[in-house]
Structure formats: C-alpha cells, structure tokens
Amino acid sequence: MSKLDLNALNDLPKVDRVLALAEPNAQLETLTAEERVAWALENLPGEYVLSSSFGIQAAVSLHLVNQIRPDIPVILTDTGYLFPETYQFIDELTDKLKLNLKVYRAGESPAWQEARYGKLWEQGVEGIEKYNEINKVEPMNRALKELKAQTWFAGLRREQSGSRAHLPVLAIQRGVFKVLPIIDWDNRTVYQYLQKHGLKYHPLWDQGYLSVGDTHTTRKWEPGMAEEETRFFGLKRECGLHEG
C-alpha cells in the first residue's frame, strides 16, 4: 500500500480520522512490536522520531526502535528536575545504544520559573498543567517542528493506567502520526525483553519506584497504590505529552 496521507487525514474531523485508521489498527493489533515498527517505516511518512522520558522501562522502546531504525532522533524533554539517577541512566543508555539524543528544554530555566510562578507543582491541577505546558508540551511541539517529524514513536502501554487502557497502536496527535509499538505489552513481556537483550530497568526500580518523572511529583509505590497514583500526587497520570 502507498504511504498514508497525513495532510488528508489532518483535514478530517477527529472522529473521521479515527475511522480512517480503523483498518490499519486492526492489522497492527495482530503484529509483533518489531513488525509494527517495520510497518510504520514502510507505510507512514518520515521524518521519524522516538520520544522517551528515560523512565523505568525506557530501555525497551529505545532498543527496539533503534535496532530497526538506527540513528532515529530520540527526543527528551528535560525539565531540569529529573532525578540524578535519571540523568545517569540517560548517559548510560545513550552510550550503550548509540542513541541520537535530542534534548529540548523550556525557554525559562527552572530557577526563573520558580521566581515568576512559584512552585507550580504545589498549586493543584491548574499549576501542574501550567508546569507541564511550559516544560513538556511546548518543548515537545518545538522538537516535532524542528525535526520535521511526521511519524512519532513512543513507548506507552495500556497496562500503565486507565488513561492509556484504550489507546490504539496508531493515531494522529499534534498533527503527526503516533505509533505505540509495545502498547499491548504487560510487565512480564517487558521484563523478558530486558533480560533477553541484556538491558536494565531505571536504577530507581530497585528502590520501589514503578514510574519516574520529576523529583517533586514522583512517589515510591506503596501497597494498595495503583501505578498512576505515584505521579502528580494522584491528581493526573499524563504529563501533557500524550494528551490531545
């Protein structure tokens, strides 16, 4: 089949876009993660990019996509508030997997933001959303534009939260195709992939963290907590990158 026409799909109402992607999604559900990446490279337009927060399971999608598409730009939106272990993990994986890392940050430094707005993450949902818009959404939008992305790979999984439970393999977000190759993987499959390829979880996994973001909005998992409750004080699951 010829490559899907992104411009034509973007001209459709959202409901019609979903319907137009129903047939490809039905096919993609039957494929392996590796086959989904190969399908996307064959049927979706470039440029291609991969985003990563370098979180708990980040090594999976970074390894999987990069081995099929070496040198694919890997977008990291750096808030300046990541854990020291995360920055060390970024360096380790970038070296080990020979990643083409592209780091994007807000126009205002963390210190300047705090001077202007206070600690936004302590200001309820509205504060968190403003923080995410400044530090996550705007830098990602800039990255997609500067890298001329038309197809965006990400490592989301349905098992991670209720907000991700019904996501399709293929969608259109921020005006580009978005592909989620490991969307249907469970924790066991993630573990098996890491073991098979000699990869590691994020260093904080061993300290009881199920999900890792910024230091000020990430909590260790405790018995009785859902994974999504370990982020943003349980007020939100998404940082804004995967919404909209």
UniProtKB/Swiss-Prot annotation:
- Active site located where? 239
Give the disulfide map. none
Q: Keywords assigned by UniProt?
A: Cytoplasm, Oxidoreductase
The answer to whether UniProt assigns keyword Translocase to this entry is no
- Lineage, top-rank taxon, reads Bacteria
One GO location term (cellular component): cytoplasm
A Gene Ontology biological process annotation? hydrogen sulfide biosynthetic process
**Catalytic reactions on record:** [thioredoxin]-disulfide + sulfite + adenosine 3',5'-bisphosphate + 2 H(+) = [thioredoxin]-dithiol + 3'-phosphoadenylyl sulfate
Q: Which PANTHER family does this UniProt record tie to the protein?
A: PHOSPHOADENOSINE PHOSPHOSULFATE REDUCTASE
- Describe the function of this protein: Catalyzes the formation of sulfite from phosphoadenosine 5'-phosphosulfate (PAPS) using thioredoxin as an electron donor.
Q: Would you tell me the protein name for this molecule?
A: Phosphoadenosine 5'-phosphosulfate reductase
User: What is the organism of origin for this protein?
Assistant: Salmonella agona (strain SL483)
